[in-house]
Amino acid sequence: MKRTVVWVKWADAHTSESGWLDIDQYEDDGETIVDTVGFLISYPDDGSKKDHITVWQTLCDGDGIHAMHIPVGMVRSMVVLNPPSN
């Protein structure tokens, strides 16, 4: 089965500088945007997760490795790199 390959840009949770900070001096540096590319598995298909965009790094004969489950609220964009064909 051919799978759709996607490029997902999403906002990751992140920490501020290490150590003690003066809260009054803290500056918001915006979102940390991450790029993920892989095989899209849509919910409710096996290997997916509800309310998430699920992207697998590698698929082979029904097995997969390195699934990334990205909460839909964190997704900023998604581009289909190759539409599936039969």
Task: Describe the function of each predicted region.
Residues 2-86:
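Conserved RNA-binding domains used in RNP assembly and mRNA/RNA metabolism
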